[in-house]
Amino acid sequence: IEKDQWDSIDVEVGMHEYPLRSFGGTGCTCNGRHFMGTGFYRFSLDWWAEFDGKHWHERTPVPGKTRTLAASAATEQYIYVTGGTHYGGVNTTGEVLADIRRYAPQTDHWTYVAVLPEGLINHVCFTIGKRVYIGLGETSDWQINDKLYWFEE
């Protein structure tokens, strides 16, 4: 990026208003396709969408409890969405989630993978080859997590 020169694009919504007005979502690129979702707008969200550079295309929502502050990462075939906080509304304290969900872009299908040893928020998720790493961040009792977990596809 040269001397802080940024370009912006006008995004045509094509979906409900809340995806673009939410915060705390997650997103990543899988095999050249760009996905994002979850987040918070009055309550935790489960939406999932593909962005082609100009238009949003609604996809199958993330199953399980709605979430904000989740993390995601992709391998060549799948996207993994992990952890986050479930808020049922603005007056709830939230529940830190520990589940791992796998999304297959080629079939628009979600699969439950596993439960982490503890719920995590503000954490990282990344891949090296077929190994998925999840950790750091904060636990359900707001303690700093110094663990990094991993599994292989």
What residue spans do the PLM features occupy?
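Kelch-like beta-propeller repeat domains
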Residues: 1-153
